[in-house]
């Protein structure tokens, strides 16, 4: 099975609508590792690692978003797979990439 890592930035109404919690739940069900966090500019940033087809499904999920969100743009940057995550977490703290 091919592995993939996607670094994703989601724009729109994605703060205060449980976007991170729903992202974590979706990643858990897909067996994806990585993290998600809010950014101070109003976007959400996430990194997804796992089987290529499951990461693709997770990126597509981001385009739809959580029930109360309204996604306007999803930027995806492909990165080399590192295999550094054993679970998917909501992170807090330092801003930036």
Curated annotation (Swiss-Prot):
Residues 5-92 form the Acylphosphatase-like domain. Pfam families: Acylphosphatase. The active site is at 20, 38. Gene3D superfamilies: 3.30.70.100. Keywords: Hydrolase. The keyword Hydrolase applies. GO terms for molecular function: acylphosphatase activity. Its EC number is 3.6.1.7. It catalyses: an acyl phosphate + H2O = a carboxylate + phosphate + H(+). InterPro entries: Acylphosphatase (IPR020456), Acylphosphatase-like_dom (IPR001792), Acylphosphatase-like_dom_sf (IPR036046), Acylphosphatase_CS (IPR017968). PROSITE patterns: ACYLPHOSPHATASE_2, ACYLPHOSPHATASE_3. Belongs to the acylphosphatase family. This is Acylphosphatase. It comes from Syntrophobacter fumaroxidans (strain DSM 10017 / MPOB). The gene is acyP.
